[in-house]
Amino acid sequence: MNKLITLILVCCFAFNLYAEQLPAKQFSHPERIRYDQHCFTIEGRDIFILSAAFHYFRVPQELWRDRFRKIKEAGFNTVETYVPWNWHERTMPRNVKDYSQCDFDDLKAWLKMAHEEFGLYTIVRPGPFICAEWAGGGYPRWVAKFCPAKYDTSFWLRSNHPEHMKWTKHWYDAVCPVFAEEQLTRKKSGEKGIIMVQLMESEKKEEVLRDMAAYCTNNGIEVPLFTCVTPEVRGSKDAVISQLFDMDNQYVWWNIQEAKSRIEDLKRQQPNAPAFVCELQGGWFSTVGGGLSEDSYLDGRHARGMALMAMAGGSTGLNYYMFFGGTNLA
């Protein structure tokens, strides 16, 4: 028994020593929002982030209040959405500095309703690549026009090629000011706002992450930036990347034991940030004339088991993906 206690103490000491060797996290407004290895702290209160995924672009605006009401009544304190570039800038601009084709009216209305009417925090995920079972992964079709001849379009999008990064910056320069206006740090004490912004989905190139982080901060983003299933972020000592934190995904078909072990792995690899599940999947999509979600859906007991096992592993943030699925209308 004494040997076991000694082993546990040695492991805890090594864990803390590793965390202390990593660059200290810097927060623009730590009195409003910050985090450590345990959880998020918002306005001085430790918060378990219980989030529901609900995508405004998949739901008619007339139904938003009904969906928000259900989310609130189910006990969630946060709502998450992707923000697809091809939804907001459908027509090709004249040049990279032209933002006249962007229309963010529905995004602004959705954020305002979440924050002011229903008192929910929000998490936004602007890509530019968003996966999300959405056409083109969120990229506008016109972006392919700028793909260099020697590249396959699917590989060029999500690359660190200068032309791709130029248009990625264009998108961030357009959408980040919308986020900046609605982020928690710009709101009065007690009001709700955006608490996190995600960089490109599953990005592996460090130079891309550094550039995208700069696109955010240069456009006034002050809340924490995160990535999703990006091991390069975990335990990074890079001056910029170390200020990001990575989240995990947990998929609908998994054995629930994996939920706990993956969270434990995340905490070991990233000991200076909270363990957060960006997508705790509760089902899958149906296709018109094809398979139904029920064909691959394990019932609510499985989703509940996944959530409990993630929390048993030490997770202090969960995003149910999706809480409300909606319909791809385009």
Q: Model regions: which residues?
A:
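Catalytic-core region of carbohydrate-active enzymes that cleave or remodel glycosidic bonds
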Residues: Y215-T217, N249-A330
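An active-site-proximal structural segment forming one wall of the substrate-binding cleft
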Residues: D103-V124, D152-K192
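Aromatic-lined substrate-binding rim segments of carbohydrate-active enzymes
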Residues: W64-G136, A213-T217
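Active-site neighborhood of glycoside hydrolase catalytic domains
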Residues: H164-K237
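N-terminal carbohydrate-binding accessory modules
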Residues: A19-T78
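Sec-dependent N-terminal signal peptides
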Residues: L4-F13
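Short, solvent-exposed turn/loop segments enriched in Gly/Ser/Thr/Pro and often Arg
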Residues: V79-W87, R125-A135, I195-E201, V229-E232, ...
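Aromatic- and acidic-residue-enriched segments that line the glycan-binding/catalytic groove
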Residues: P93-C102, G127-R158, L209-R210, I241-D246, ...
